Structures are given as structure tokens and as C-alpha cells.
């Protein structure tokens, strides 16, 4: 049987606008049962979420997973901190890098890979306003070039 492709649950599209992505990592996500069901239904939001290292463990903060509709009193808290699973050596390398000024761990997307929930984490540096303006200007220039090329063809 063929492997099923990764199923993306949600993306943090604003992260690429607000940060320079330096490196990306894959981490497992520790979830409760109702959280898995909500994620499979696509009811999650990565806006304003971030990861931090505390006591040698990696935690995902501010990720909103809506309560499961059919869940009863055993439902989960929507914005609870969720543990991320990575090798200890990777966590320590990230800890050293996040000590640098201006670097942060930002989740880019949540997806299912072989039935397990994963998070794509990025080591990112915040953009200044003029960097964002430069990116927008480049994008507009590329659009103009594509529009002109399409008009000639």
C-alpha cells in the first residue's frame, strides 16, 4: 500500500511575512484524544503561537485547538501549553541558538505524517518594517514582469 501524503491541518502564513526563516525542524506533538479529533477536523490556529524551551523540554504556547464538538466534560482546554518531542541534542542546539538576540522558535504548520501529529518549527529572526516593505516591492516587481511576459506571449 502506498504511503499517504502529509495532511496539513493549519499553517502560520503570517510567519513568513513577519520573520526571516533561518532553519526548519520537525517535532512531534503531544496531544489529548479530543485534541486529535479537533485537529483532524482542521479546527486549529497557529496565530501568535511560539515555542520555548523550559527545563530541557520544548513547549508550544498559544496554539489554539478548538474544543471537540462531541467531547463532553473530558474536553481539553483550547490554549493549553503542548509538549513537543525532539531529540535532546536538537533541543539543546536550539536552546543555544535562541539565546542569541532576536531569534525565536515559530511554528509554521501542523500536519499529520503516518497518523502522528507533527509541527514544523522554524528558527526565525523578526523582520523590521523596511524589510517587509522590501519584500512587498520585490513581489510587486515580479508580478509586473510576469504580467508583461504574459502580455507578449
From Swiss-Prot:
**Biological processes, Gene Ontology terms:** trans-translation
InterPro entries the UniProt entry points to: SmpB, SsrA-bd_prot, SsrA-bd_prot_CS
Keyword set includes Signal: no
Compartment(s) where it occurs, according to its Swiss-Prot or TrEMBL record: Cytoplasm
Chief subcellular location: cytoplasm
What Gene Ontology molecular function terms does this protein carry? RNA binding
Its keywords, alphabetically, are:
Cytoplasm, RNA-binding
- Pfam families in the record: SmpB
Cellular component terms per the entry's GO annotation: cytosol
Which superkingdom? Bacteria
Xref: PROSITE patterns: SSRP
Similarity comment text for this entry = Belongs to the SmpB family.
PANTHER family recorded: SSRA-BINDING PROTEIN (PTHR30308:SF2), TMRNA-BINDING COMPONENT OF TRANS-TRANSLATION TAGGING COMPLEX (PTHR30308)
Q: What does this protein do?
A: Required for rescue of stalled ribosomes mediated by trans-translation. Binds to transfer-messenger RNA (tmRNA), required for stable association of tmRNA with ribosomes. tmRNA and SmpB together mimic tRNA shape, replacing the anticodon stem-loop with SmpB. tmRNA is encoded by the ssrA gene; the 2 termini fold to resemble tRNA(Ala) and it encodes a 'tag peptide', a short internal open reading frame. During trans-translation Ala-aminoacylated tmRNA acts like a tRNA, entering the A-site of stalled ribosomes, displacing the stalled mRNA.
UniProt-recorded name of the protein: SsrA-binding protein
Protein source organism: Desulforudis audaxviator (strain MP104C)
Question: Corresponding gene?
Answer: smpB
